[in-house]
Amino acid sequence: MSRTNLPIQPAKMSDATSSKPQIFSIQDLKQAASDKMSQMYRDYYNGGAMDNITLATNEAAFDRYLLRPRVLRNVSNIDMTTTLWGTKAALPLGVSPSAMHRLAHADGEVGTSKACAARHIPMILSALSNDTLEDVSGQSSDGSTPYAIQVSPFKNRQITTNLLNRAKAAGYKAVVLTVDAPMFGRRLDDLRNGFSVPPGFSFPNLSAQTQSGSGGLGGGIPDLSFDTGATWEEKIAWMKSQTDLQLWVKGVTSPLDAQIAIEQGVDGIIISNHGGRQLDTTPATIDILREIAPVAKGKTRIAIDGGFRRGSDIFKAVALGADFVFVGRIAIWGLAYDGSNGVGLALDLLINEFKLCMGLAGCSKISDITPAHLSLLNAKGVLEGVY
């Protein structure tokens, strides 16, 4: 099925006002986007597993890390650029994989990609996307924006092989293996809402035999059984035998697993608790980064997602040792608010906030950002070093 024939699911459910609200922050954007979505899809994107404790903790944890700016530094020329997957990126910010962008807006993943490509922001495409991986990467007409394809440990390995081959041919730079979801988390809002997707919703990157049934998320989701017997040694070796794309693993939350990932020779890890959507009451990812960075820094690339809402949050992650930060819901909120233009608005907010934070903290380039720019406010209200 071609992209133009894919069903369109309007996100807006009310025409109470034709004027757009003023958006000055990601929190403004979240509210405006949520107002446009139906309850079912708003709860699907905004909610987490069980009691949403991890979801809330991911965001709240940033408030304990306080900025310690250096002054009288030359910040007349701020360079935010870095590299990812062997390609230059505008700043250490990318878009995480999230499924079914067309539930938020008809622009879908192509709309998200268009906004990313215009700003040289890397994007990880979910296997459960509504647009073809070729159309998504095609938004970077000159190939200067790096893309990665996300895969899960599917029991049917031909699904993974097909995705890897297509991604390689389409110029993708990496594959991101999700390792924290051998089964779906218990998401109470989705159960209460009877979550399903519109009839005829398509997943063009998956083989025809997976296109019917329920994959554990709800009605209309492809029947994708996960390999619950997958192990580090066997799975990583098999993935490497199937592709020469960079191999990253997403969903690492233990220093012990970070060490195993290094031993298995992965190119990078993404510290992630799935945005609080899998196992509730896990620690905030920014706190986990503080544990993992001393183990992994200099041995593999370190990225992180979960709870990022401000440019200063990105700064804090870099100061703690992250090479890169990914955001998922923020792109969805932008998409729901105003399609591809809304994604651009979301990214611009973070870009401008990050640049401002660098300047006010006395940093003119990424390598200037160090742990000395942070203090941790402990439970006694006393500032202490982060390392």
From Swiss-Prot:
Residue positions binding a 2-oxocarboxylate: 44, 187, 277
Protein name per the record: Oxidase FUB9
Pfam families: FMN_dh (PF01070)
Stretch list, region Disordered: 1-20
Entry EC no(s): 1.-.-.-
Matching CDD domains: alpha_hydroxyacid_oxid_FMN
Organism for this UniProt entry: Gibberella moniliformis (strain M3125 / FGSC 7600)
Biotechnology: Fusaric acid is phytotoxic to plants such as cotton and banana. It has been shown to induce programmed cell death in plants. In addition to a mild toxicity to animals, fusaric acid exhibits acanthamoebicidal, antioomycete, and antimycobacterial activities.
Chain segments annotated as coiled-coil in the UniProt record: none
